Amino acid sequence: MAAKIRREDEVIVLAGKDKGKRAKVSQVLPTGKLILEGINLVKKHQKPNPQLGVAGGIVEKEAPIQASNVAIFNSATGKADRVGFRFEDGKKVRFFKSNSELVK
C-alpha cells in the first residue's frame, strides 16, 4: 500500500502537546509512526560512553508521533488536508482532496 504521508512532506500536528504546529517529516517508521523536525521533543538521560566518544548528560531528541495525529499541509489553501490517489499517464500520484492539486 502506498504511503499517504512521505518523507519531506509538510504536516500539521492534530493532537498532542504540539497541536497546531507545522513541521517537515524527517523519517517514516514502518510501525506507522513519523519523526518530525522539532516536534515531540523528549529529554533522554544519556549515559557516557568513552569508547564511542559519547558524552553523558540530558539530551533532547525527537520522539516518534503516530501518523494518525498529523495531517498533510496544503500550501494552496493554508490548511490541513486529506490525500487521495489516482492514476495519471499510467503512474499512481497523490493529490489533495480539497482542490485536486497534486502533492509536490
Curated annotation (Swiss-Prot):
Top-level taxonomic group: Bacteria
GO annotations under biological process?
A: translation
Gene3D superfamilies linked: 2.30.30.30
Please give an example of a GO cellular component term from this record. ribosome
Q: Which UniProt keywords apply?
A: Ribonucleoprotein, Ribosomal protein, RNA-binding, rRNA-binding
Which InterPro entries does the record cross-reference, listed alphabetically? KOW, Rib_uL2_dom2, Ribosomal_uL24, Ribosomal_uL24_CS, Ribosomal_uL24_KOW, Translation_prot_SH3-like_sf
Gene Ontology molecular-function annotations: rRNA binding; structural constituent of ribosome
HAMAP family found in the cross-reference section: Ribosomal_uL24_B
Instruction: State the family named in the UniProt similarity comment for this chain.
Output: Belongs to the universal ribosomal protein uL24 family.
What functional role does this protein have?
One of two assembly initiator proteins, it binds directly to the 5'-end of the 23S rRNA, where it nucleates assembly of the 50S subunit.
What is said about its interaction partners and assembly?
Part of the 50S ribosomal subunit.
What name is this protein filed under? Large ribosomal subunit protein uL24
- What species does this protein belong to? Shewanella sp. (strain W3-18-1)
Upper lineage: Bacteria, Pseudomonadati, Pseudomonadota, Gammaproteobacteria, Alteromonadales
Q: Which gene encodes it?
A: rplX
